[in-house]
């Protein structure tokens, strides 16, 4: 995969070259370039912004630097690419979007700054994404989050490809609880089922606890997926168990 980032602050992306993404670059699974589009400015002061027509607060990014930076990307890497604009008005980024984008050969991230963009810049863009209903100083942090989420899904990037397939949200559910040694610590024990070596029971426990965690923490996710009969049965068990716990807690508080 080729990833290009257009940013006024290229040094912000250096930490991405560490750890997992750094290994992806070393293994030649990823080419990662950051372009400072200030270098495409047309005036001696290297301005890339200007006041908006019609008045208003703040400054807008001018079209020329970003259009010409994209020209440079297209010259170096001809061919189709997804061009992503980080914008609060974009669609919400999620795991499904990360999975889809990880299938692409070339991604370009445009990171804005200041009050906003000249509207003509949007003609360069294939996708607009937001991390949530809040505004950040620039597009760099959202781009880094997206890049990390996407690159870890590339085959061969994680030490164990199964890790990506058991992540939270991969099957629409939150991930089940996990434990390592020691089997008991400060009175907290690892569930016996995880220690008995029965893989069928372990798989059932994990599915049930994944459903439980989703039901308790993100019940909205259960409305967006279709559960098979086994999962539906496990979810009914979870709801019964949690209702019993809640009733017992109420009685305890009343006594």
From Swiss-Prot:
The lineage of its organism: Bacteria, Bacillati, Bacillota, Bacilli, Lactobacillales. It comes from Lacticaseibacillus paracasei (strain ATCC 334 / BCRC 17002 / CCUG 31169 / CIP 107868 / KCTC 3260 / NRRL B-441) (Lactobacillus paracasei). This is tRNA (guanine-N(1)-)-methyltransferase. It is an enzyme of class 2 (transferase). It comes from the Bacteria. The keyword Coiled coil does not apply. HAMAP family: TrmD (MF_00605). S-adenosyl-L-methionine binds at residues 112, 131-136. The keyword Lipid metabolism does not apply. It is found in: Cytoplasm. Keywords: Cytoplasm, Methyltransferase, S-adenosyl-L-methionine, Transferase, tRNA processing. Homodimer. GO terms for molecular function: tRNA (guanine(37)-N1)-methyltransferase activity.
């Amino acid at each position: 995969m080729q990833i290009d980032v257009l940013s006024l602050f290229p040094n912000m992306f250096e930490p991405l070259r560490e750890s997992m993404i750094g290994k992806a670059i070393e293994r030649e699974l990823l080419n990662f370039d950051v372009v400072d589009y200030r270098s495409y400015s047309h005036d001696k002061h290297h301005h890339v912004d200007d006041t908006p027509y019609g008045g208003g607060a703040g400054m807008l990014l001018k079209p020329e630097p970003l259009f010409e930076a994209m020209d440079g990307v297209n010259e170096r890497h001809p061919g189709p690419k997804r061009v992503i604009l980080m914008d609060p008005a974009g669609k919400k980024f999620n795991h499904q979007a990360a999975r889809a984008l990880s299938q692409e050969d070339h991604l370009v991230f445009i990171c804005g700054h200041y009050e906003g963009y000249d509207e003509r810049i949007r003609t360069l863009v294939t996708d607009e994404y937001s991390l949530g209903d809040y505004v950040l100083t620039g597009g760099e942090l959202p781009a880094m989050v997206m890049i990390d989420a996407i690159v870890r899904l590339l085959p061969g990037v994680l030490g164990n490809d199964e890790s990506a397939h058991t992540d939270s949200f991969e099957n629409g559910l939150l991930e089940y609880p996990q434990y390592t040694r020691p089997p008991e610590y400060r009175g907290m024990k690892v569930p016996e089922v995880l220690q008995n070596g029965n893989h069928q029971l372990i798989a059932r426990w994990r599915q049930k606890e994944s459903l439980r965690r989703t039901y308790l923490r993100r019940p909205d996710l259960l409305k967006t997926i279709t559960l098979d009969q086994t999962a539906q049965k496990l979810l009914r068990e979870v709801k019964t168990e949690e209702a019993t716990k809640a009733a017992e807690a109420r009685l305890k508080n009343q006594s």
